[in-house]
């Protein structure tokens, strides 16, 4: 899956940004493919971050497509409003609902792409049959809830399984990864078949976030190209 620049998609995570300067922090990653927003409710995960009002404010100050990752209970109720607000992609957790296909349908009806995410310890097999109802699969490579964690390479087996289905023409879906992505880990994720890479500290911890986005994109692109040769 190519981004707007012809390479892999890079989605800086504002969880690692300065929350007092979110408009400036969004501008600092101009050229990114998506802007990743982690919404946490303090219930599904132990941390509490931001919600719909902040997302609406961000949408008013940036043209970067908004990638909303909802780490919340009851996505059946809360996911569609993010799509209605103008988010490009709205992802919720498989573990948070008994009706993932219905939630995906409501997100799409509200005008956004629908994504489903699984925690590192959640098997993907029970959800393979419903993936055609989704536009994005977000594989968590850390335990959701906090940024700055160490990458869990074992989750790449999930990526490889879905990439095999995509390459065989059995499925059309974008594979995204979130957690511990940096210049030490992005190549192995790209080689496994990831399309979109969420990066927090690796971008916002850099002196030049936009340059960090470009560098990560180059690394992922080179690894993906090597895989296809």
Swiss-Prot record:
Catalyzes the reversible epimerization of D-ribulose 5-phosphate to D-xylulose 5-phosphate. This is Ribulose-phosphate 3-epimerase. Its cofactor is a divalent metal cation. A divalent metal cation binds at residues 36, 38, 69, 178. Its EC number is 5.1.3.1. Substrate binds at residues 13, 69, 145-148, 178-180, 200-201. Transmembrane segments: none annotated. Disulfide bonds: none annotated. One of its GO terms (molecular function) is D-ribulose-phosphate 3-epimerase activity. GO terms for cellular component: cytosol. Belongs to the ribulose-phosphate 3-epimerase family. The active site is at 38 (proton acceptor), 178 (proton donor). GO terms for biological process: carbohydrate metabolic process; pentose catabolic process; pentose-phosphate shunt, non-oxidative branch. Pathway: Carbohydrate degradation. Pfam families: Ribul_P_3_epim. It comes from the Bacteria. The gene is rpe. Binds 1 divalent metal cation per subunit.
């Amino acid at each position: 899956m190519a981004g707007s620049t012809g390479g892999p998609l890079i989605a800086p995570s504002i969880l690692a940004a300065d929350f007092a300067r979110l408009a400036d922090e969004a501008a600092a990653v101009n050229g990114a493919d998506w802007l990743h927003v982690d919404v946490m409710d303090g219930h599904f995960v132990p941390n509490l971050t931001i919600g719909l009002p902040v997302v609406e404010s961000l949408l008013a100050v940036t043209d970067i497509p908004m990638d909303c990752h909802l780490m919340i209970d009851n996505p059946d109720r809360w996911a569609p409003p993010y799509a209605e607000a103008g988010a490009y992609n709205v992802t919720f957790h498989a573990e948070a609902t008994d009706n993932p296909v219905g939630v995906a349908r409501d997100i799409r009806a509200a005008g956004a792409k629908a994504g489903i995410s699984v925690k590192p310890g959640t098997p993907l097999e029970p959800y393979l049959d419903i993936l055609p109802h989704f536009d994005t699969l977000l594989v968590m490579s850390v335990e959701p809830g906090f940024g700055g964690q160490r990458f869990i390479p074992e989750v790449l087996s999930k990526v490889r399984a879905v990439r095999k289905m995509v390459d065989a023409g059995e499925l059309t879906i974008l594979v995204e990864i979130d957690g511990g992505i940096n210049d030490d880990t992005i190549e192995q994720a790209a080689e496994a078949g990831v399309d979109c890479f969420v990066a927090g500290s690796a971008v916002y911890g850099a002196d030049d976030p936009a340059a960090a986005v470009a560098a990560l994109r180059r690394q992922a692109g080179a690894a993906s190209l090597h895989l296809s040769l």
